[in-house]
Regions:
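Conserved GNAT-family N-acetyltransferase fold
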Residues: 36-38, 51
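Conserved acetyl-CoA-binding loop-helix of GNAT-fold acetyltransferases
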Residues: 58-72, 99
Length: 121
C-alpha cells in the first residue's frame, strides 16, 4: 500500500533569526526550494514584513501556515505599525495578514501590494 504524504511530510517550516540585526526569516520549503517565505524586520515603532510565494506552488493553507508562524513571533505581539509587502492579487494572503491588524490600508505598487496597519498585539 502506498502512503500518502501530508503537508507536514512534504513541507518544512523554518524560522531563522539574524541576531546581529534582529531580523527574522520564516520559510516553508519543499526540499531545497522555498515555496513561500517572509522576512520580518522590527524597528522601534514599526515592523516591516515582506512575503513572497513561488508561483503556482503554495496552496492557501500553506500561505496561512506561513502567516500564522510570522504572527507567532514575539516581535509581532506588541502594538505597533505593520508595513507589509505582499504579492499583488493574493487576496488569501492579504486576508490572513489583515486578521492580525486594525486600521488596514492597502495600495498597489508595481507587482506588490503595500499594506499598512496596526498590529493587535
Amino acid at each position: 500500500m502506498n502512503a500518502s504524504l501530508t503537508d507536514s511530510d512534504q513541507y518544512t517550516l523554518s524560522t531563522r533569526v539574524a541576531a546581529d540585526q534582529g531580523a527574522y526569516h520564516v520559510s516553508i520549503d519543499a526540499g531545497p526550494y522555498h515555496i513561500a517565505y517572509a522576512d520580518v524586520r522590527p524597528t522601534c515603532s514599526s515592523v516591516e514584513l515582506s512575503v513572497d510565494v513561488a508561483l503556482g506552488n503554495a496552496a492557501p493553507r500553506l500561505r496561512r501556515r506561513l502567516i500564522d508562524a510570522v504572527f507567532d513571533l514575539d516581535v509581532m505581539r506588541t502594538p505597533r505599525t505593520l508595513l507589509a509587502t505582499l504579492p499583488l492579487g493574493d487576496v488569501d494572503l492579504l486576508d490572513d495578514v489583515a486578521q492580525h491588524c486594525v486600521n488596514v490600508h492597502t495600495r498597489a505598487a508595481g507587482h506588490s501590494c503595500l499594506v499598512d496597519g496596526r498590529l493587535l498585539g
